[in-house]
């Protein structure tokens, strides 16, 4: 069946947001007395839900993890999200897809209101029919995508999930979407996306329209 609904990850797919995310982790570690980590280590935290990352770092200390999440989000909302910008070619890709009548949505592990504010601040909100993210009821990529599909009444067999990390691909598979599309300009790599079972890999935003038409 023809694809009609395209669900995009946000960080590493639409936005180059690494500087703000890494700075938010550094601030949180300083505030929480946690040793600083290398940029390479911090980059692995981009994509998974924040709760999972801090639960791992907390090593069983739930109170520490909860406080760290609050600290991170406070900094990110005030400063970190302002440091993001769309990748080269993203705006043109979104406009081309809209001209071909695809319905575009965001399905991100970012906190939902933060994702909405980021895209509004970057004047990108108008390209999306819905912006869905992490909420207490939906905190994994699989659950966020399920919520997105349900609320938009999008059928999985006419939908695709597009993202840069294995979580995006797995989320798409677990929701039985027609295609999972891995992007190579973000924070994952070809090996990660292939191992996750991505149906298609693209290296530049403009390739998306070519491969789904």
Model-predicted segments: where are they?
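N-terminal helical cap/lid subdomain that shapes the substrate entry/recognition surface
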Residues: 2-91
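Conserved Lys-Pro-Asp/Glu-containing loop-to-beta segment of HAD-superfamily phosphomonoesterases
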Residues: 5, 142-169
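Substrate-recognition element of Asp-dependent hydrolases with the DxDx(T/V) motif
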Residues: 25, 93-119, 134
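Conserved H-loop
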Residues: 35, 125-129, 155
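A short, structured active-site edge motif that brings together acidic residues
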Residues: 45, 125-139
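Surface-exposed amphipathic alpha-helices with a cationic face
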Residues: 91-98, 149, 169-174
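Acidic, Mg2+-coordinating phosphoryl-transfer loop and its flanking beta/alpha structural elements
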Residues: 160-200
């Amino acid at each position: 069946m023809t694809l009609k609904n395209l669900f995009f990850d946000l960080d590493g797919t639409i936005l180059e947001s690494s500087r703000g995310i890494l700075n938010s982790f550094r601030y949180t570690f300083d505030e929480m007395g946690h040793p600083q980590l290398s940029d390479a280590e911090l980059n692995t935290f981009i994509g998974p839900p924040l709760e999972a990352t801090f639960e791992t770092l907390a090593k069983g200390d739930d109170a520490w993890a909860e406080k760290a999440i609050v600290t991170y989000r406070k900094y990110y909302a005030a400063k970190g999200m302002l440091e993001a910008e769309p990748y080269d070619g993203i705006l043109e890709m979104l406009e081309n897809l809209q001209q071909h009548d695809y319905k575009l949505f965001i399905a991100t592990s970012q906190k939902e209101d933060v994702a909405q504010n980021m895209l509004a601040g970057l004047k990108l909100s108008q390209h999306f029919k819905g912006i869905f993210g992490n909420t207490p009821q939906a905190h994994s990529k699989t659950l966020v995508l399920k919520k997105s599909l349900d609320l938009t009444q999008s059928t999985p067999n006419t939908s695709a999930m597009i993202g840069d990390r294995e979580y995006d691909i797995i989320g798409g598979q677990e929701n039985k979407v027609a295609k999972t599309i891995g992007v190579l300009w973000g924070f994952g790599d070809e090996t990660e996306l292939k191992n996750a079972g991505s149906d298609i890999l693209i290296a530049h935003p403009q390739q998306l329209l070519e491969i789904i038409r």
